[in-house]
């Protein structure tokens, strides 16, 4: 695939802690239900999976937020559960219930059936990456992503989202051997999956460890971070003549920042409970940081959003040898007012230009 030269590489340079003229911004779940145009496309597709498994629809919704806002990166429209779906677990999105699996992994016989899926069964994802890259035409970089081995395992064992993680923690404490086997398979599958996204044209990749923060200290390192590190160590890090940065985001992982930063990633994503300046001192600018505005700030109105954006940028401090990508501390809420996102993007770009110039 012939690719257009990148017109805006500020996001990639910030991830690599290179000098940039301003702080780049993108938002987790930026292509999503808060946008009326997304809901219209989803209605045409008929279902979430109808949207995610059709490269043209996936491309359409990936580009929608960029038509509204001058964001500095696009992120592939997909779901972290495509990999276990390809393992045969039967992913379904019930209206109002979120994702669930028809065949959760609960015992030894279930684990014995698991295998790294043939990446050809996920071709629709890689086709979407190629389509999006073509349509972006070098405007901004494209981010690929996957769930961390632990986070995917939570859904695989629980069968759906959970409030207490009782089923997977029962396995963790009662049959850790089974859980390690699941995590080994997940790590291998995720490595292949992300490398295939990179081969298709993803210019950066992100691992979402959405549920790492539910683990006790010591167990996080053993059951989450160790397998995240396996994935990161096996990724293609050079493509199209430049480095492919890797972002690792553990929601609730503030106490483990130093250890996450040492896993081989280029950037660590932060949730909103962590002070950016403190986090920066703790990782000593060894990696870039991404985050970390509370998503609920968007419900406070334009003035509050602009003030909190400035506060977040000030918290990071003088850029110097550090790297900062502005984002929310978690995915944007489906109820967020789209017009306030415009205020956020404008404030980050305008205010940070002055900071970088000084």
UniProtKB/Swiss-Prot annotation:
This protein's pathway: Porphyrin-containing compound metabolism; protoporphyrin-IX biosynthesis; coproporphyrinogen-III from 5-aminolevulinate: step 4/4
Main enzyme class: lyase
Reactions performed catalytically: uroporphyrinogen III + 4 H(+) = coproporphyrinogen III + 4 CO2
Principal place of residence: cytoplasm
Cytoplasm among keywords: yes
Enzyme Commission number, as recorded: 4.1.1.37
GO cellular component, one term: cytosol
Site feature Transition state stabilizer, where: 79
Localization in the cell: Cytoplasm
GO MF term (any one): uroporphyrinogen decarboxylase activity
Keyword Cell cycle in annotation: no
Amino acids binding substrate: 29-33, 48, 79, 155, 210, 330
InterPro entries referenced in this protein's UniProt entry, alphabetically: UROD/MetE-like_sf, Uroporphyrinogen_deCO2ase_HemE, Uroporphyrinogen_deCOase
Known role: Catalyzes the decarboxylation of four acetate groups of uroporphyrinogen-III to yield coproporphyrinogen-III.
Self-association state and partner proteins as the record states: Homodimer.
Family of the protein in this entry: Belongs to the uroporphyrinogen decarboxylase family.
Protein name per UniProt: Uroporphyrinogen decarboxylase
